[in-house]
Amino acid sequence: MRICLVLEGCYPYVHGGVSTWMHQYITVMKEHEFVLWVIGAHACDRGKFVYELPDNVVEVHEVFLDDALKLKEHGNQKGQLHRINRFSEEETKSLRELMECSHPDWEVLFHLYHDRKMNPMSFLKSEQFLNILTESCLEKYPYIAFADAFHTMRSMLLPVLYLLGSEVPLADTYHAISTGYGGLLACLGGYVYRRPVLLTEHGIYTREREEEIIRAKWVIPSFKKQWISFFYMLSEAIYKRAFRVTSLFTNAMLTQIQIGCDAEKCRVIENGINYDRLSQIPLKEEDGWVDIGAVVRLAPIKDIKTMIYAFYELSSRMENVRLHILGGVDIVQYMRKLDFTILTSISEGQPLSVLESFAARRPCVTTDVGCCRELLNGKEGDDFGCAGYCVPPMYRDGLAAAMEKMCESRRRRIRMGKSGQARTKAYYRHERMISEYRKLYREVEEAYGRDWI
């Protein structure tokens, strides 16, 4: 089977949990060919991969959102305007609903911008666009400067309309690794070639964007609700079109259903790691120090600032502690030097760094995000025991107290480490995860036939 993986802002451009997962996934699935359809922010990153692509990656198609800013109106502007002025009632309705971030008919928009090659700039400079925007502003933003609404709407719509005109790589199935822009491209692929669409979410993309927008200073406060609705609208598109939607843990699946995904489509497939590679790492010998590790990429969502503040507080109470912030290293070599690990993210899915730490018999202190609490304490029916401490995000004092408690007793660390290792061995092995995805692809074959490329 030729599978088009639709990726946004991760593999193969940057290291990180999702990128590591993706690289291992492709490498093991040797029986399939993979096409990478990747969305990046900046065209200057074209071809700058930090991974050596496996042999079964047969094509890479790169799309960069800043290329949308280079769009110009077609030379045949009169023809474009003629088509805009003759939008059907169905097309006008879908464009209005797109601008209102409600429930547009995406097939109508795919036909308009992909099949008929409507130029996004022609529409965004048209009288039709201004009329729809004016009506919306009078209804929703009567006291907001029209210029603010105009530029907000253009910046919101331009990337989407640009992506709808993308050249679509041919594949047997389109497997998106997030909702958002990536999910929309997967829907476009399914539309163009009438092929099935799959979705795997490592986190809940919509909720992550919502958190970012709430904190963002670049978004005009009056339009934050509109931006949040925009990303919910994109999620709805792939939730409706996807044949199956997978998540990493039960609460994430329940969130998908709450947002609007059909429960019948949803399935939990937990992350998996190379357990055997990590389980043989010996515990660090006692040397008078307690060494704490953070295996993390430097990104705002990882909240390294709180980690450093919390460690400063800890070091004022205990003199024999050291913090190692690691990224892009051979985890096997560094894990030998650590007594336990920490994770301070403000948002996560099912962090591989925690599972890797458990496999090596190192307990963890984490923030209460994603399924971290489930990893530490176990899900229903799991009696392996506690494997660490969980504290609220951005809670500096709580994090310092949890680290101090972990530092106080080597015996406790060993006991918790054994619990984490047993849990990982039972539920989070890479072989088990791959088996579930192979089963998923077989379901696609059975549902859609085997008329593959």
Label each residue range with its predicted role.
Residues F34, I304, I308-V329, Q333:
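A conserved nucleotide-sugar
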Residues G190, G398, K405, R412-Y427, ...:
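A short, well-ordered alpha-helix in the C-terminal region of glycosyltransferases
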Residues V160-L170, V192, I204-Y205, S222-V245:
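Membrane-proximal helix-turn-helix segments that form the acceptor-binding/catalytic region
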Residues I346:
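Aromatic "clamp/platform" in nucleotide-sugar-dependent glycosyltransferases that forms part
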Residues P363-T366, G370-N377:
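Short hydrophobic beta-strand element within catalytic cores of glycosyltransferases
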Residues N251, G272:
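Carbohydrate-associated surface elements
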Residues R277-L278, P282-K302, M307-F311:
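Conserved donor-binding/catalytic core segment of Leloir-type glycosyltransferases
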